[in-house]
């Protein structure tokens, strides 16, 4: 449900409701005047207490002795009429009789089961209020009334209540406390109707709306079928799930469970602070973590990816902050790794800085791109989602770009480089990949498509060694840099059958500018210059590695390219 649209609708409703009520009651007053005109055509008629007579244009009710009744109701044809202290028929006015309050219309008749918009009984200059007069004509006071299937509340002065209404002793009054859970608290719209199964956007019940200050904020509330504000978790509100705190305020952004039924926001929405929430999602140790969007949305997200600010930065007005991808399951739980149930692995994040660099440190740079605590090393957790493999940090933020695991955390002792795609991608890649460095230069990578550890292939990890006639290091294609042919060293890790840990060996390869491995025992020239002299050498079963102790010093290169 788009609550932002509803907010605009409620504003329009407030503007039109008062006009509607005035028009409705005006019709009732005119009709009563017509009745009076009809009665005025008579000079006298019988009443239960005596006889009505018109004298000098005014109606009086006389007893059998000919004395005019005063300050009492006289009944005629089943209708009650009131005569005042001068005996005259009272019209369109309040009447107080034996401590009870009534209202007579323009015909002088006591109204019953009807409404009046009028000034209070004892103050004609005060603002008009709505009053309801029951079947006996008495003003409704300190009570709840059902009228045409709708519920209304009235205070001790009989004024119809709107906005937040609370039980006060044996009666009802404007709300004075924000405690909607431990009190009978309801909300009535501008027409006085108690809202049920409805949303309302307003200040908290304890806010004096005649004295609102900058610290007061409006919030969304949901009024259940009972009329009371929802607290805790409320499911199936037009098919969506929402969360509310103990005061009934709809929770937004990051929401966590605090007790058996309680929920709270895990971010700082106080405009008077710097907006920074100190506790990360992993530090909360909450049994439930949800994401509910902003106040114009508010429902719990589920079975989807969401891109949002971390909870420690959510609500901050800072353009330097980054959004992260989070995964939410079908139950609406945000995935945040649980160390009691799963084991993470140490890793370092990298970005491809210069794919043409001579060394790993030239090619890759450590990167703190994806964590609000500004760290590079991290513990990452593997999770399969929709048949794809993703990695997350301890706060549930999806990782991207390159990550290289810590060898000490790997059972086989091999550090593995993975590629997780860009910011809006994130799943672990395998096979051949073309990736651009920071300067926009495209580089070719290859990541193993399965485990073949005895040949040095580890599933989805960047290959170290030969694959399909090409040479790779941490998955990056190794090519000749300055000369047409060059010797390149790569450390190869293999796990022999029946073993659990890997053996490392440095292998030397002859490669050309395209990264193709050369396997002929001959002189390799760049123009007329011999740049690699491999005559007399053999090539091993490591798919093209030079055979002499894998030591590059045994092969002549450049100006010393001789046998």
Label the model's feature ranges.
Residues 2-563:
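Extracellular adhesion/carbohydrate-binding repeat motifs centered on closely spaced tryptophans
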């Amino acid at each position: 449900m788009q609550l932002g649209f509803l907010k605009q609708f409620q504003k329009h409703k407030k503007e039109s409701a008062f006009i509607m009520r005035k028009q409705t009651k005006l019709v009732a007053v005119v009709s009563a005047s017509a009745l009076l005109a009809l009665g005025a055509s008579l000079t006298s008629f019988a009443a239960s207490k005596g006889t009505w007579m018109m004298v000098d244009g005014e109606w009086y009710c006389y007893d059998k002795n000919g004395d005019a009744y005063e300050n009492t109701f006289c009944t005629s044809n089943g209708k009650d009429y009131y005569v005042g202290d001068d005996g005259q028929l009272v019209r369109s006015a309040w009447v107080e009789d034996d401590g009870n309050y009534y209202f007579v219309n323009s015909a002088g008749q006591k109204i019953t089961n009807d409404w009046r918009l009028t000034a209070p009984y004892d103050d004609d200059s005060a603002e008009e209020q709505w009053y309801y007069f029951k079947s006996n004509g008495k003003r409704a006071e300190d009570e709840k009334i059902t009228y045409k299937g709708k519920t209304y509340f009235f205070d001790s002065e009989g004024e119809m209540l709107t906005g937040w209404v609370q039980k006060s002793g044996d009666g009802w009054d404007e709300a004075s406390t924000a405690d909607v859970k431990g009190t009978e608290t309801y909300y009535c719209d501008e027409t006085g109707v108690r809202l049920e199964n409805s949303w309302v956007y307003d200040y908290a019940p304890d806010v004096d709306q005649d004295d609102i200050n900058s610290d007061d904020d409006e919030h969304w509330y949901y009024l259940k079928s009972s009329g009371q504000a929802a607290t805790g978790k409320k499911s199936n509100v037009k098919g969506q799930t929402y969360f509310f705190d103990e005061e009934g305020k709809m929770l937004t952004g990051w929401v966590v469970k605090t007790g058996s039924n309680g929920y709270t926001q895990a971010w700082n929405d106080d405009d008077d602070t710097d907006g920074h929430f100190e506790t990360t999602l992993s530090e909360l140790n909450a049994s439930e973590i949800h994401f509910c969007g902003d106040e114009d949305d508010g429902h719990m997200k589920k079975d989807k990816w969401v891109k949002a600010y971390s909870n420690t930065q959510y609500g901050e007005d800072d353009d330097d902050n980054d959004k992260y991808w989070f995964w939410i399951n079908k139950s609406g739980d945000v995935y945040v790794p649980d160390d009691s149930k799963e084991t993470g692995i140490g890793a370092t994040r990298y970005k491809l800085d210069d794919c043409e660099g001579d060394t790993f440190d030239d090619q890759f740079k450590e990167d703190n791109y994806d964590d609000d605590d500004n760290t590079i090393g991290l513990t990452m957790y593997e999770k399969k989602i929709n048949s794809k493999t993703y990695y997350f940090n301890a706060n549930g933020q999806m990782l991207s770009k390159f990550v290289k695991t810590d060898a000490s955390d790997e059972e086989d002792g091999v550090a593995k480089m993975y590629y997780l795609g860009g910011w809006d991608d994130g799943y672990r890649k395998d096979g051949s990949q073309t990736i651009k460095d920071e300067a926009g230069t495209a580089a070719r990578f290859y990541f193993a498509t399965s485990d073949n550890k005895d040949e040095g292939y580890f599933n989805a990890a960047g290959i170290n060694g030969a694959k399909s006639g090409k040479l790779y290091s941490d998955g990056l294609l190794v090519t000749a840099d300055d000369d047409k042919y060059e010797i390149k060293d790569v450390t190869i890790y293999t796990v022999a059958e029946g073993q659990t840990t890997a053996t490392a060996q440095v292998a030397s390869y002859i490669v050309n500018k395209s990264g193709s491995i050369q396997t002929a025992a001959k002189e390799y020239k760049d123009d007329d210059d011999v740049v690699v002299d491999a005559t007399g050498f053999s090539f091993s079963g490591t798919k093209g590695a030079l055979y002499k102790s894998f030591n590059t010093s045994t092969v002549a290169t450049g100006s010393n390219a001789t046998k």
